[in-house]
Regions:
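RecA-like P-loop NTPase motor core of helicase/translocase proteins
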Residues: 1-198
């Protein structure tokens, strides 16, 4: 049995477009590769993201969708252990809220491919609260693969479950120049010993 997906659900398209509009005006970073893995150049997302653009775009998206307008960006900040020692990381946090049963998983998976199409972003990590949800996302990636390939002109993408003991998997994520989707649980993300935190 094969599932048929409707690519034209208006409320889903509005959610995808809302996320994509956050990055309007951001440019491809002009600098070369930022880091290396074992002497090999890694391929980062290359979008120059300015906080003033993000805030202006966020306000426009909120106004368009009848959402109370934020006066400032909200951030997640924490200390993490890296190969260069303890570092504080800080990044903007955005939320897309949808009712249960409206296709949230479909929307955020399609949003990843839309961000690739519009802005050339390649690296995506999906962090979920449980193993059951992780398995559901991996299953959804499998059953939507043909549908997404038709929508995005056979754009190649690779998805998999993060496994901390699989160093080659993390290496592929870093070095690949195609869309990479890594799915992991919050517990595996929070372990200090994980390769992803180094």
């Amino acid at each position: 049995m094969q599932f048929k997906f409707d690519a034209n659900q208006d409320y889903q398209l509005r959610a995808i477009e809302a996320v994509a509009r956050l990055f309007e005006g951001c440019r491809f970073a002009s600098s070369g590769l930022d880091f290396k893995w074992g002497g090999l150049p890694a391929v980062p997302n290359r979008l120059e993201i300015r906080e003033d653009f993000l805030l202006d775009n966020l306000k426009k998206v909120q106004q368009t969708n009848g959402i109370p307008v934020d006066s400032e960006l909200k951030y997640i900040e924490r200390e993490i252990q890296t190969a260069n020692g303890l570092q504080v990381v800080r990044f903007p946090n955005f939320s897309v809220e949808m009712e249960t049963g409206t296709g949230k998983t479909y929307v955020y998976l399609r949003t990843l491919l839309e961000l690739n199409k519009q802005y050339g972003l390649l690296k995506f990590i999906i962090v979920v609260p449980s193993v059951a949800i992780r398995e559901g996302i991996l299953k959804t990636l499998k059953i939507t693969e043909q549908h997404f390939r038709e929508l995005y002109h056979n754009q190649p993408y690779h998805y998999y479950e993060y496994q901390s003991e699989n160093l080659s998997q993390v290496r592929q994520f870093s070095l690949s120049n195609q869309v990479e989707i890594m799915v992991m649980t919050i517990d595996s993300f929070n372990k200090a010993s994980n390769v992803i935190n180094q």
